């Protein structure tokens, strides 16, 4: 059954759903390439795998399929300027070389990310306007978020993760 919910109503509902802001990156013949994304989640612990939903017209879409690898870099509140850079620049201009290095697959990873998942491309599935990209996690790197929580997108603005005081 096709949904009868109107697109603006769906978009408003999803704006209320907080999501971790990530930089999804890979390499291409023109250098590093990536996008900012919130449609990322774990798929399975055995085997360790994740999924990323990437618009079929996004600059990184075909590059991930061609490279066969990608990295998901969870951003912290320190990375608001990086999000702006990704929205204002294109291609390799989004990447300040001193901040990025490969882990295992060759995909660029952010040196001070809250978390990095370095993945090999495992499978893809059609998701209407998007491709659901499944990655096998080849390497992980956990950063420090003690002084800066994870960067979230909630109600169409930046938010931060922070622990709640137990009651």
Regions from the PLM with identified roles:
Residues 1-167:
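Basic, polyanion-binding surface patches
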């Amino acid at each position: 059954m096709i949904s009868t919910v109107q697109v603006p109503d769906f978009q408003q509902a999803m704006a209320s759903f907080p999501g971790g802001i990530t930089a999804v990156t890979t390499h291409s013949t023109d250098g590093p390439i990536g996008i900012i994304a919130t449609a990322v989640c774990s798929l399975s612990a055995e085997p360790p795998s994740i999924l990323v939903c990437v618009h079929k017209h996004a600059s990184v879409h075909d590059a991930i399929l061609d490279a066969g690898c990608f990295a998901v870099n969870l951003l912290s509140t320190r990375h608001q300027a990086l999000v702006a850079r990704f929205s204002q620049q294109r291609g390799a201009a989004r990447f300040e070389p001193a901040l990025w290095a490969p882990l295992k697959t060759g995909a660029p990873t952010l040196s001070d990310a809250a978390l990095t998942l370095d993945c090999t491309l495992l499978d893809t599935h059609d998701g209407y306007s998007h491709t659901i990209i499944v990655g096998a996690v080849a390497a992980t790197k956990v950063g420090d978020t003690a002084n800066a929580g994870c960067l979230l997108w909630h109600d169409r603005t930046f938010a931060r993760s922070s622990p709640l005081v137990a009651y």
